[in-house]
Amino acid sequence: MKPVALILVFLAISQARVLNLPKEAIDIPVAIVEDKEPPVALSLVKEEVKAEEVKPEEVKPIAQEEKAKDLKEEVKPEIKPEIKEQPKPDIKDEIKEDLKADIKEELKEKIEEQINELPNAKPLELKEKSLEAEEKPQEIKEEVQQPEIKKEATEIKEEPAQNILKSLPAEETVVVPAEELSPNPVEQEQSENQDAAHPQVRQATQATPTQQSTTQGNFVQQLIQNSPIGQFLNQFQPQPAAAAAPAAAQVQADDAAAAAPATPAPTVPGFLNPQAAITSAQQAVQNAAQSAVNATTQAFQGIQQFASNLGNQFQNTLSSLTGQQQQAVSTTPRPPGPIQQFVNNVFGGNNNATAAAPPAQQSGNPLQGIINFLGGNRPQNAPAAAPATQATEKPAVDDKIDPANDEVGEFVPESDNELRASGENIDDSFEDAGVPSNEVIVVNDDAGEEGNAVQNHPVATDAVAL
């Protein structure tokens, strides 16, 4: 930025010096000239000048046109006769001589080949044709290429076809149409071998390019049918219909052979019939989708069965482990099963609680034993006594037992708060089960206390002492 600012300052100073006005006034003499002529004369002078300027422009193109005409007249007689006279006769003579020599050699070779191939041909006719070929080369080419071949083909079709139909058996006559209708490559090879024995028939019934494409399409179709994908395609292209087609073709071939030796009709290749291809593709896609859905459903069913088996096995292992733990540890008469099953066992007429405990341990919940052990149940070595005299000392319980009441605390010392909590939980479970308030069982697990007894309400006649 600094050098730019310096350059700008320098330029401003230099321009200021140039524009400095002189201190003294400068007197410049000025002469005023007055035109006495009217201003209209100026316009006339300008128009005359324009007219003079236009005149030489009109003269110039005339001179150019004259020069162009002179040049054309000079160029035309010199160039045209040289081009027309010199090259034409030389080129025509040379081309004619070369063409005649080539045509004569080609015709001689063709005539010799025809003589070798057709020994029955007449030599006089060939000589006449050779003389005509020398005179008219172009016409003879067309006659050699088109009419002779057609005549030979018609003779071959008429003479040997009748002999073959009479001499050969009925199976060999069906060979030619079987090439196009049978998709099997083995039959195609057999038909080709049979045609090799009779080259004349092969020339008369040579397959066209469209028929070759049909054989290729049939071969590809056979490969697809032999592949695993063909199982899907065979559902939409039944085999009985395909087997019936050759039989009908044989009948038609027999009729045609009896009437006249007609060439078989070309079959439509697969790629020229798009509707059938589209329908078969759609059906194949639908079959593939259905098979995929079936496979996925089977896989999901297998996964579900496997998961259920794992769950059952895991539950069985847990039940076996918890069952061993209950047999070794839990000796309390409290059953590990559900509460409703316990109530049914207690009030169903079973007077012995220990007898009702083992079937309750085999309940559907395998973790009930661990929950009961952690809930406050402890091993009890001393047997529980249930005197009837102590039951009368307890006041009657009118309502539900709350955890804050002191009725349970009278029989349980303060040091056994955990046991008291377990008893309260048992009472809560009875409340949830819908047991009447007159049939409540209070369990005290401390065997050292004198008041260690299960106190039942006198109204509950079927209560079991623990």
From Swiss-Prot:
It comes from the Eukaryota. Residues 1-16 form the signal peptide. The keyword Glycoprotein applies. Glycans are attached at residues 294, 352. Residues 404-416 have a biased composition (Acidic residues). Residues 55-94, 119-220, 378-435 are annotated as: Disordered. Residues 124-160 have a biased composition (Basic and acidic residues). Residues 185-194 have a biased composition (Polar residues). Residues 170-180, 203-216, 379-394 have a biased composition (Low complexity). Sequence repeats lie at residues 48-50, 53-55, 58-60, 70-72, 74-76, 78-80, 82-84, 90-92, 94-96, 98-100, 102-104, 106-108, 125-127, 139-141, 148-150, 155-157. Residues 48-157 are annotated as: 16 X repeats. One of its GO terms (biological process) is imaginal disc eversion. It is found in: Secreted. Probably has an essential role in embryogenesis, induces morphogenesis of imaginal disks, and may participate in multimolecular aggregates. The regions 203-253, 256-333 and 335-377 are thought to contain either alpha helical or beta pleated sheet motifs. This is 20-hydroxyecdysone protein. The lineage of its organism: Eukaryota, Metazoa, Ecdysozoa, Arthropoda, Hexapoda. The gene is ImpE2.
